[in-house]
């Protein structure tokens, strides 16, 4: 048992995983599921690139500000549901967040193996 799987600081979230659907024209596309999965995750503030940081400081009434966090589920979540797709959305503290970029897989040792995601709220 590892602190990556247990311990404090996990918070409840709803996960709307990516699903493949076929639109009215017969085209395949991905979108967030309408049915959420209840889960727990840890969150840490993530550093932003210079461009993102400048955009957050622009004087335009706060309409384009953004927050970026690193999110990690217990390893049991990844075993059960796999790695989440790019169209996945997260509901955390009553707000919708989008996955940003690809998942980061850490697999240098079994004790530290985990998957991290970056989430962004626009």
Curated annotation (Swiss-Prot):
* Highest taxon listed in the record's lineage: Viruses
State what protein this is by name: Gene 20 protein
What species does this protein belong to?
A: Mycobacterium phage D29 (Mycobacteriophage D29)
């Amino acid at each position: 048992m590892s602190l990556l799987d247990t311990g404090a600081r996990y918070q409840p979230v709803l996960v709307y995983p990516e699903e493949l659907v076929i639109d009215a024209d017969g085209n395949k596309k991905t979108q967030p599921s309408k049915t959420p999965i209840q889960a727990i995750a840890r969150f840490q503030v993530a550093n932003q690139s210079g461009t993102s940081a400048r955009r957050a400081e622009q004087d335009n009434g706060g309409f384009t500000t953004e927050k970026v966090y690193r999110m990690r589920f217990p390893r049991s979540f990844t075993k059960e549901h796999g790695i989440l797709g790019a169209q996945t959305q997260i509901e955390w503290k009553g707000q919708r967040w989008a996955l940003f970029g690809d998942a980061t897989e850490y697999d240098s040792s079994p004790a530290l193996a985990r998957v991290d995601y970056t989430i962004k709220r626009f």
